Amino acid sequence: MENFNQIFTLLAENEGIGLNTDILETGIINIAALVGILIYAGRDFLGSFLEQRKTSIVQGVQDAEGRLEEANRRLSEAQKQLSQAHIVISEIKNETISAKKVLLESDAYQAKKDLTTRFSRALATFRSKERQIFLEVKEQIILLVLKRTVARAQQTFGPKERATALITETINKLEGDLL
C-alpha cells in the first residue's frame, strides 16, 4: 500500500497523469493491425472453436435441465413416500397408545390384586406377632406377680410349713385361673 501511495505522489509531483495523443508513439496502429490479422487468419479456427464451445454449453444446459427435471420428479416421489411414512407412523403411534392402555389396565388390575394379597398377608403376620407378644408379656407379668407374692409371703409368714402350704395352694389356684 505504501508503494502505491509513492507512485501517485511521484506522478503528481513531476508530470502528473495525462493522455498521450500521439498515435505513432502509443502503438495503437500496431495493436489494431494485429487484431485485424488475428481476426482474418483465425476466423475459421476461432469460429469452429466458438461453435464447439456453444454446442458444449447448450448440451451442458440441456443436461442440467434434464437432471433438474429428474431431481424434481424424485423429490415429488420422496415427498409422497414421506407423507405415507407419516401416515404409517401416526397409525403405529395410535396402536401403541391403545396397546399401552390395555396393558396398563391389565397391569393395574394385577397390581391391585397382588397388593391386596400382600396386605392381607402382612396384616395376618402383624396380628400373629401381636398375639404372641401379648402372651409373652402376660406370662412375664404373671411370673413377676408370683415372685413378689412369694417374697412377701415369706416375709410375712416366715419359714413355717403351714405358710408354705398356703402359698403353694394359692399359687396353684392362681396359675389355674390365669392360664
Curated annotation (Swiss-Prot):
One matching Pfam family: ATP-synt_B
Molecular-function GO terms, alphabetical: ATP binding; proton-transporting ATP synthase activity, rotational mechanism
Highest taxon of the lineage: Eukaryota
InterPro entries linked: ATP_synth_b/b'su_bac/chlpt (IPR002146)
UniProtKB keywords: ATP synthesis, ATP-binding, CF(0), Chloroplast, Hydrogen ion transport, Ion transport, Membrane, Nucleotide-binding, Plastid, Thylakoid, Transmembrane, Transmembrane helix, Transport
Main location: plastid
Localization annotation: Plastid, Chloroplast thylakoid membrane
Record's GO cellular component terms: chloroplast thylakoid membrane; proton-transporting ATP synthase complex
Membrane topology listed for this record: Single-pass membrane protein
Transmembrane segments: 28-46
Note: In plastids the F-type ATPase is also known as CF(1)CF(0).
Function, as annotated: F(1)F(0) ATP synthase produces ATP from ADP in the presence of a proton or sodium gradient. F-type ATPases consist of two structural domains, F(1) containing the extramembraneous catalytic core and F(0) containing the membrane proton channel, linked together by a central stalk and a peripheral stalk. During catalysis, ATP synthesis in the catalytic domain of F(1) is coupled via a rotary mechanism of the central stalk subunits to proton translocation.
Family label: Belongs to the ATPase B chain family.
Quaternary structure, from the entry: F-type ATPases have 2 components, F(1) - the catalytic core - and F(0) - the membrane proton channel. F(1) has five subunits: alpha(3), beta(3), gamma(1), delta(1), epsilon(1). F(0) has four main subunits: a(1), b(1), b'(1) and c(10-14). The alpha and beta chains form an alternating ring which encloses part of the gamma chain. F(1) is attached to F(0) by a central stalk formed by the gamma and epsilon chains, while a peripheral stalk is formed by the delta, b and b' chains.
Protein name as catalogued: ATP synthase subunit b, chloroplastic
Native species: Trieres chinensis
Gene: atpF
